[in-house]
Amino acid sequence: MAGEITHQSPEDIENELVRRGHVVTSWDSIGEITIEATGVETSSYRIGLPSLESSPTVFKAYFPPDCRIEAHTHACDYSEIILEGTQKVSGKWLYPGDIRIGLANRGYGPLIAGPEGVTVLVIFADGHWPAVTIGAGDGSTLGTGELLDRFSAAGEN
């Protein structure tokens, strides 16, 4: 039936990739979670086989207006693209079309969504994307546990 959304788990995607060599999906089919502490809404998928830690990881995330995420880092290189809205990162305002490129283990932040919120696409070089706290941050705004529960590699749950 046209328009009907079918949920695709990482395992479903992996099985189809192995069988056919490619898969067509959507953000709606992948599904999203909302981080309780911040209201951030996010979805994720892996480029390549979801079970491989070496597969690049893509997140699409919406940060509500004025949402603040503490300074942190990641254990892999990444890039963030501002799709809609504005975001202040380490004191610099970013706008739609801006691209931020970051190296592993180099801290940044805080991230503060603009008054209209912000939607971003973040591409991590591999599966080592979970945020790592730095400085005085306690991790409460990162939602790492919730993200790992939902978006860890296929077969790890």
What is each PLM-predicted segment?
Residues 76-78, 135-144:
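Short intrinsically disordered coil segments
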Residues 38-48, 53-73, 93-96, 103-107:
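Conserved short histidine dyad/triad with adjacent acidic residue
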Residues 1-54, 138, 148-157:
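A short, N-terminal "cap"/entry segment at the start of jelly-roll beta-barrel domains
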Residues 61-64, 73-88, 93, 123-125:
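Short, conserved beta-strand element in jelly-roll/cupin
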Residues 68-78, 113-116:
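Short, surface-exposed loop and linker segments with low hydrophobicity and enrichment for Pro/Ser/Thr
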Residues 130, 143-150:
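Long terminal segments
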Residues 91, 110-112, 150-154:
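Short, charged low-complexity intrinsically disordered segments located at boundaries
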Residues 93-96, 104-134:
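Ligand-binding loop in jelly-roll beta-barrel domains
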